[in-house]
């Protein structure tokens, strides 16, 4: 039973006249929300977790190695000694190391891990706003796995390039090993791993907990044979990964390091997916080196929606993939990630987002594998699911490093293969050595030495030739700062502010691309009492007007109390979970953080699948709420948005009214910007007009080091008119609008003119009648009276 179906039961307490169903349809996909990390749970490892669990610490980037941050109870310095092969020969993919652990010599036998990594994937990055293909220097054959000689149940998984970095399991104790960067003697740190954190997932599966495992459906013998055949063969998930700008900076703004780190993460995720006989293959990587082309707010629900739109528009036609995952670097508050259930192999919803705001690769890879499981149709486990001796099932609400797929996960995955025929997972990717892909002129992507790429529209393109070179005299071919094949003037406005919390960007006169989108730092005050988040002022009045149109506004407190204390799908502070089968009732302090309740509604919105509206009488008006829980439009438009004001110095975050410190606002504009500007999302000053960046202390035209140079007021006025006729398409649209206006206005003008002429004619006839000369008899009479008087 779906979440919406379960909600209908809870809504039955409302009287039917009060519930006016606008639309209600079943959908097939569901977004998943992840909760925050909990740092107080211990981890005790057992031998059976060898492959799937602890491999994930293998590739901790050495630049982020911080022994004080590792959950360890003790550590020692060791010097691994690589042993030569028998007879001095290279064993070919095999290597042995000797090291001293706790006073005892341990011999490690390792073998290169087969099949992974795939080395023929394209790597894209941006240079002056132009998408280009990179060829980073990558280490190959770095990932080795093996065992300790003479230690039953032992397991070793390490990266041997640039020292040993990874995990060793001995007698149910897990050890981490990392090289010491300052050592000249190949010294390493070996430490025991304890008290590892877990990720908690609080989202309800699409089916009720009692039905999650699903009784076996009656299948035809042929179906069973097909499923058995599918299960016995390795499945391949072709994954495209995107790294956002902040995470790229956390990897030292180094493309080589970022690529290697992503390859390592994918390799480690494979140690989980082996449990369902599936291999993740990296088919492409894009690094947002110059800023994020989409809005990436704290709320990952919005990020998932924005990323999926970007994926459909920019990626689908460029690189074939079964799923695409976005890795972001910021702390997302209560959420750790988002994924579409059953999204793999679908062109519309093959997306997920994960937050990697720490350096615990182990936990992050577990989260990635969990979300990938949802992409593959695997729902959350319930208490009756089993996953062997592991402490946590990977698809349970508690996701730990000691995790694995359960029997329920296998059943869900089998049904996904059956329902979707598993076509996209059964294609084995080609095994080729990694090489730079030759530029493919005409694919719409600027590659290698291409100056432009007009795709299939080269014949009519004014700037780019079919040979992917700029035409004679052209400086550029596309971009917000390119007009008529030339760069726009320095200081021209290229992206105006969309909200009071957004900031404008300007062209620098030397490139065709507009600078990355910038906005006021999350937590900046707006509209008197509200706060900015992701470039938008989280004002509930504005949210109501966006849904219902003007003059809708946020309802009074009585409406919020009446609606959000019902604990049904029209009013709640949280959806059901497998631990709690009911909707959450909003407490008094959280009542403004549940469903958005609006009043003064004059127009009903165009509803979407699975949307319903509720109206509750309030005085002479109505209070309106919306149940918009579905997968094609996340986040739920009916919920109060994260970051919305709920009490003095407090904001809503995951249905809870909490301190505004969760927005991580750390700007002091009076000090940093000398009171002449605000802080942007890059934590730089955006100066008011009349002051210059970087600190707004000297005269200038305003802006920031991120926004591009701001033109003088006269230039900005010209750039606005420049924007108004930026392209021939815009001109055509304007001409069409003008033509339509003329068609409407001219007849009206003619009618009015005709009426005026008729009125003038009528008035003129009346005037003529009044002033017309007297008749002859009247003249004679008048004349006789005159004679009489004279006598």
From Swiss-Prot:
Region span, Disordered: 201-220, 772-791
Residues in the signal sequence: 1-65
Keyword vocabulary terms for this entry: Disulfide bond, EGF-like domain, Glycoprotein, Hydrolase, Membrane, Metal-binding, Metalloprotease, Protease, Signal, Transmembrane, Transmembrane helix, Zinc
Principal subcellular localization: membrane
Source superkingdom: Eukaryota
EGF-like domain mapped to chain residues: 663-697
Identification of the protein by name: Disintegrin and metalloproteinase domain-containing protein 1a
Organism annotation: Mus musculus (Mouse)
């Amino acid at each position: 039973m779906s979440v919406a179906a379960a909600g209908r039961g809870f809504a039955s307490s409302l009287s039917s006249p009060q519930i006016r169903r606008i639309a209600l349809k079943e959908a097939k996909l569901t977004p998943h929300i992840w909760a925050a990390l909990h740092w107080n749970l211990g981890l005790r490892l057992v031998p059976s977790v060898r492959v799937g669990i602890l491999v994930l610490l293998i590739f901790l980037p050495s630049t982020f190695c911080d022994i004080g941050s590792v959950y360890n109870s003790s550590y020692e310095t060791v010097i691994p000694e690589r042993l030569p092969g028998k007879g001095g020969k290279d064993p070919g993919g095999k290597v042995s190391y000797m090291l001293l652990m706790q006073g005892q010599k341990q011999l490690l036998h390792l073998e290169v891990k087969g099949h992974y990594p795939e080395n023929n994937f394209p790597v894209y990055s941006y240079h002056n706003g132009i998408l280009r293909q990179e060829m980073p220097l990558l280490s190959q054959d770095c990932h080795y796995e093996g065992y300790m000689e003479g230690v039953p149940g032992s397991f070793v998984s390490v990266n041997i390039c640039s020292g040993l970095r990874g995990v060793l399991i001995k007698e149910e104790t897990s050890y981490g090993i990392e090289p010491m960067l300052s050592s000249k003697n190949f010294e390493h740190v070996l430490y025991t791993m304890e008290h590892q954190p877990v990720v908690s997932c609080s989202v309800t599966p699409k089916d009720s907990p009692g039905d999650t495992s699903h009784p076996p459906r009656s299948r035809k013998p042929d179906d069973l044979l097909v499923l058995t055949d599918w299960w016995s063969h390795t499945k391949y998930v072709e994954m495209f990964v995107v790294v956002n700008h902040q995470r790229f900076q956390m990897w030292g703004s180094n493309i080589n390091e970022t690529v290697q780190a992503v390859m390592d993460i994918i390799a480690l995720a494979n140690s989980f997916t082996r449990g369902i006989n599936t291999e993740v293959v990296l088919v492409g990587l894009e690094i947002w080196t110059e800023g994020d082309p989409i809005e990436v707010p704290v709320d990952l629900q919005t990020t998932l929606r924005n990323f999926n739109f970007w994926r459909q528009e920019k990626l689908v036609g460029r690189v074939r993939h079964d799923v695409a995952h976005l890795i972001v670097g910021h702390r997302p508050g209560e959420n750790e990630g988002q994924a579409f259930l059953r999204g793999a192999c679908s062109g519309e919803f093959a997306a997920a987002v994960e937050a990697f705001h720490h350096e615990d690769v182990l936990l992050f890879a577990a989260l990635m594998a969990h979300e990938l499981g949802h992409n593959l149709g695997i729902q959350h486990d319930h208490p009756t699911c089993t996953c062997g001796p592991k402490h946590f099932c990977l698809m349970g609400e508690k996701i730990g490093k000691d995790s694995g797929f359960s029997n329920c996960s296998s059943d869900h995955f089998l049904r996904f293969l059956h329902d979707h025929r598993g076509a996209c997972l059964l294609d084995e990717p080609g095994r080729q050595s990694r090489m730079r892909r030759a530029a493919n002129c005409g694919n719409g992507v600027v590659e290698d030495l291409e100056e432009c790429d007009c795709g299939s529209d080269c014949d009519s393109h004014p700037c780019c030739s079919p040979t992917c070179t700029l035409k004679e005299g052209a400086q550029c071919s596309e971009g917000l700062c390119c007009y008529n094949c030339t760069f726009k003037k320095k200081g021209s406005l290229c992206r105006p502010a969309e909200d009071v919390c957004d900031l404008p960007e300007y062209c620098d006169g030397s490139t065709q691309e507009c600078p990355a989108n910038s906005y006021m730092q999350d937590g900046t005050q707006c509209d008197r009492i509200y706060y900015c988040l992701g470039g938008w002022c989280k004002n509930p009045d504005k949210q109501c007007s966006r849904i219902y149109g003007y003059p809708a506004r946020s309802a009074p407190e009585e409406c919020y109390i009446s609606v959000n204390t019902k604990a049904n799908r029209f009013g709640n502070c949280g959806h059901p979970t497998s631990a709690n089968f009911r909707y959450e009732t909003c407490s008094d302090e959280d009542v403004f953080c549940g469903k958005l309740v609006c009043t003064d509604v004059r127009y009903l919105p165009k509803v979407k699948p699975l949307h319903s509206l509720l109206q509750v009488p309030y005085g002479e008006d109505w209070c309106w709420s919306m149940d918009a829980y579905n997968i094609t439009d996340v986040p739920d438009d009916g919920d109060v948005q994260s970051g919305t004001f709920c009490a003095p110095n407090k904001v809503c975050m995951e249905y809870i009214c909490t301190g505004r410190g969760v927005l991580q606002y750390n700007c002091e504009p009076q000090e940093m910007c000398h009171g002449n500007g605000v802080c942007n999302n890059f934590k730089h000053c955006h100066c008011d007009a009349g002051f210059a960046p970087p600190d707004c202390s000297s005269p200038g035209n305003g802006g920031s080091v991120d926004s591009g140079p701001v033109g003088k007021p006269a230039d900005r006025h010209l750039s606005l008119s420049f924007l108004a006729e930026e392209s021939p398409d815009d001109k055509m649209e304007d001409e069409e609008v003008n033509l339509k206006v003329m068609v409407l206005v001219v007849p009206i003008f003619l009618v009015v003119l005709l009426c005026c002429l008729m009125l003038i004619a009528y008035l003129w006839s009346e005037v003529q009648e009044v002033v017309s000369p007297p008749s002859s008899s009247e003249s004679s009479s008048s004349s006789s009276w005159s004679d009489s008087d004279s006598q």
